A protein has these predicted regions:
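Alpha-helical hinge/cap motifs
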Residues: 14-15, 66
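Short alpha-helical elements of helix-turn-helix
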Residues: 7, 15-19
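C-terminal regulatory/oligomerization modules of transcriptional regulators
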Residues: 1-5, 24-27, 31-35, 39, ...
Length: 125
């Protein structure tokens, strides 16, 4: 996933209403725009604008049946985002493991030498 696509996706998912729309679609399956709007205390036009942002991010698709617009969740972009966050987590896990190893090594050195970098009489300083 390129940076621009990821940015659009994260921006779209960054809004509470859009996350609620996406969650509803995942839980209930594809829905008409009017049925989706019935779940929110806002105008049909406002819900449509949120859906448009989700569409642009690839998080939902729209198909038309006559005059009805049916909206469905698309989970593939979420999987790609999960992979990106997984990569970040791996980097942090490695950094934390290195920090832990460094701290454990210092503790072992202190035990061998009998030092712990603490003054013997803290009040004397």
């Amino acid at each position: 996933m390129d940076d621009e696509s990821l940015s659009r996706l994260l921006k779209a998912a960054g809004d509470t209403t859009r996350r609620r729309i996406l969650t509803l679609l995942v839980q209930e399956g594809a829905m008409r725009v009017t049925a989706l709007a019935a779940h929110f205390e806002m105008s049909l036009n406002s819900v449509s604008k949120h859906i448009k942002v989700l569409e642009e991010a690839g998080l939902v698709t729209r198909r038309t049946m006559g005059r009805e617009h049916i909206i469905a969740a698309e989970l593939e972009p979420l999987r790609l985002t999960e992979e990106w966050f997984g990569q970040l987590k791996s980097i942090w896990d490695l950094r934390l493991a290195a920090l832990e190893a460094a701290l454990m090594g210092k503790d072992e050195d202190d035990e061998r030498t009998g030092t712990d970098d603490k003054p013997e009489n803290p009040g004397a300083a």
